[in-house]
Amino acid sequence: TAQRDMNAAVSCERVEEIFQKAMSDLDAVKPGDIEVTFRLIGALEATQDVDLTKDSYLPEYVTWIPTTSYDLQEDATVYDLYTKAIGEAGLRSIGEENDYVRTIYAPSCLGGYALSEFTNGARSGWMYTVNGTHPDRGLKNWKLKDGDVVVWHYINDYAHEAADWFDDPDYPALGDGTYYNGWLRAADISPEQYVQQLLGKILKVGKNGTVE
């Protein structure tokens, strides 16, 4: 009998715990919440400065956080989304508190290197798009709306790769559009999946003895 009473008490405590968790979850979803998506696209470290005016050398873009949905309050900014996404992914970055991200550290499975402004060349750095367009302000000053699609991406050579700066004389678009939005060519998969695919390619040796 004593054992049954103890089991019943434990069960009641468990039910109460589950109930409190459910109420907490309901409180967290308040009317007016918005749902947005976020994707983070980095790049491999360059072995030379990227300058698409001179040659076609371009480090590969790699997704660091695949497209993920996030629930935020209706007055949330890109900063709120960015810090939530980076934090949940366990990544580190520098500068967001000052409204300009200078550095993001790659996922550990990719080596954890620091990818910063100018790492891959004089016109390289971090940018972001909302619904496909680069906003004209910092991440703390852009409010999000329900359904917004945010892509935070590295750019190796903004003069050749950013398609939406035609009217800004300080950032003239160069080239013929060949390299526009190159970061979007990265597969929308986790960095772990990218590494697995890369290892698979390395291990797949063709009949002629070369790596395919």
Question: Model features per residue range: what roles?
Answer:
Residues 21-211:
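Ubiquitin-like/PB1-type beta-grasp interaction modules and other compact soluble beta-rich domains
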Residues 1-33:
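Beta-rich interaction/scaffold domains
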